[in-house]
């Protein structure tokens, strides 16, 4: 049996242990996934959040695992899942795991703005928190694309029905303006 096949079987067993309902197996699987998990485990882990198979404490442990992922290619996979309509129910949880993460999501600035304008209040709040914590630097095209999402939002809706969301969108617009100014300043230094 090849090394890849053994790894896949091990991950399958660990994912089964997460669903077992046995806390001892669950905790052992979490510890093992912290060491042996790879990009292929992210979607099944998020999928588990959609079910009622986890106790509240196990659910919290699983969310913590997602928040502490240290895989360099995790941001691409997480963003793919966030945009997947099958996971809308757990989107705020996944967004929260991003701003708790140590991974760099700066490349996805415009994606967060898009989610903020299209999502509900909670999505917007989570995206604002993420954007506030992005380190950059930001590519000019991402800032421009993000500004276009804001402009389209303002032009198409005029005003959101949720005043709280409108305040958050305004804060995002100010952050984008600051990011744009920071880029201009860096060009002249």
Predicted regions and their residues:
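Extended, low-complexity, acidic/polar intrinsically disordered regions
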Residues: 144-189
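Short, amphipathic alpha-helical segments
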Residues: 88, 92, 106, 118-125, ...
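Structural detector for internal amphipathic alpha-helices that build alpha-solenoid repeat scaffolds
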Residues: 1-5, 26-37, 47, 57-71, ...
């Amino acid at each position: 049996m090849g090394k890849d096949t053994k790894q896949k079987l091990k991950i399958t067993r660990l994912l089964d242990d997460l669903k077992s309902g046995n806390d001892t197996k669950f905790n052992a699987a979490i510890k093992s996934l912290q060491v042996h998990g790879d990009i292929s485990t992210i979607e099944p882990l998020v999928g588990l959040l959609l079910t009622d198979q986890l106790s509240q404490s196990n659910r919290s442990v699983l969310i913590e695992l997602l928040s502490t992922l240290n895989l360099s290619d995790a941001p691409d996979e997480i963003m793919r899942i966030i945009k997947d309509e099958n996971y809308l129910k757990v989107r705020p949880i996944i967004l929260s795991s991003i701003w708790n993460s140590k991974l760099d999501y700066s490349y996805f600035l415009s994606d967060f703005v898009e989610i903020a304008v299209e999502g509900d209040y909670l999505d917007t709040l989570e995206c604002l928190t993420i954007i506030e914590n992005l380190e950059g630097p930001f590519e000019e095209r991402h800032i421009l694309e993000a500004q276009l999402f804001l402009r389209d939002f303002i032009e198409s809706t005029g005003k959101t029905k949720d005043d709280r969301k409108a305040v958050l969108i305004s804060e995002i617009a100010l952050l984008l303006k600051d990011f744009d100014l920071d880029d201009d300043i860096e060009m002249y230094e």
